[in-house]
Swiss-Prot record:
Transmembrane residue ranges: none
Family stated for the protein in its record: Belongs to the UPF0180 family.
Pfam family, one: UPF0180
Coiled-coil region: none
Name of this protein: UPF0180 protein BCE33L1278
HAMAP family, A to Z: UPF0180 (MF_00506)
Domain of life: Bacteria
């Protein structure tokens, strides 16, 4: 059985949060930089290229920018990076 990832998702991306939960991932809402710690990757809107400092080294995993992507495309990005 595959271990599911801990994914930080910006709070405005509720459709992405729901889809990732349905896939079995642990979803953490990103309200501050501290929320990103311990996440395998983070999904941000991309409206602010450095949302709360997450684009810097505050997380060990990938930062996925959801701008221009469908919910399914974001989920595929998460799967390929975790």
């Amino acid at each position: 059985m595959r271990i599911m990832a801990r994914i930080g998702v910006e709070n405005s991306l509720t459709d992405v949060q729901q889809a990732l939960k349905q896939q079995g991932h642990e979803v953490v809402t990103l309200n501050s930089e501290q929320d990103a710690q311990g996440c395998d990757c983070c999904v941000v809107t991309g409206q602010d290229s450095n949302m709360m400092g997450i684009a810097d080294a505050s997380i060990k995993g990938s930062v996925i920018t959801a701008h221009g992507l469908t919910t399914d495309e974001v989920c595929q990005q998460v799967e390929s990076r975790t």
